[in-house]
Amino acid sequence: MKKIFVFLAISLISLKLFAQVSQVRVGLLNGPTCVPAAYLMENKKSISADGTDAELTYEKFADPQALLPKMIKKEIDIGFMPANVAAKVYNAGNKSIICCAVVGLGNLSLITTDENIRRFTDLKGKTVYVAGQGATPEYMFRYLLKENKMTWSGEKADITMDFSIPTAQIAAQLISGKIQYAVVPEPFATIAKTKSDKVITALDFQKEYLELTGEKEVYPLSVMVVRADFAKDNPKLMEALLADYDAAVNWTNNNAAEAGALCEKHSLGLAAGVVTKAIPVSNYTFVPAASAKKSIEKLLKLFLEGDKTSIGGKLPDKGFYYK
């Protein structure tokens, strides 16, 4: 009888190990965040860990709000989203989703057709259309305005922030002359400037941030996340996957034209030409979460100052950062 129990125990352990590495389900965001993933979609159908191959599957989502329910229901293992969204989910729930790497640094700018804008104070009395209410563009803009002693709320506000135009439509509205000032991430600044030589980058948020903070590297914009239980059960698989994504980022940064073509081929929501032109200024990177903790927390503190609910009321604890 004892031998039977031992045999069953070994069998169950073997089945569990097999299940752990049979498939890795990756959730991608359409648009600029996951451009480096196009390389993996083209070249990585599986991933090896401890001599066993796990199939890589990819599912695309319009935004983090569409992706998150599937991660929470354990239908997706790996995902991508803004750092504040990941922190909010971690703080609000049972810490089921953690950050494993920063994959994109800041690439925000104020674009305009007004050549007279040279500094933030030149925006006084203007209406600025901002991409992404409650996201990094809004809170980074708030921070930079505050540091330049500018206000954006109240009856005597120096500027008006408007969030009424979807991000993908801002470039067209600017080119048509319906609006004149906008805060956008890449590749939307590149799209606008490519289609009209009247559109210029007036304010580089990264440059301003570095000058104000004394930091050596700009703020994180997007992160890769993983289900905490998946990461715990599959450390070797995670190690291999993170190494592969790191390589994909390096390849993308060094092969802009080819990366643009792959992005269009795999229907990630952007035309090849746009991606190719935007990659040099998109700040794709790969920084393991443990190494990026300081920069992530610095960014999240800006969210806390602006709206505590934007990250779940507090900075996430050390368990948020995958090691």
Protein language model regions, located:
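Secondary-structure end/capping motifs
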Residues: 231-306
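Sec-dependent N-terminal signal peptides
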Residues: 4-13
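Conserved C-terminal helix/tail region of periplasmic/extracytoplasmic solute-binding proteins
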Residues: 297-323
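Soluble non-cytosolic domains of exported or imported proteins
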Residues: 31, 61-65, 80, 131-139, ...
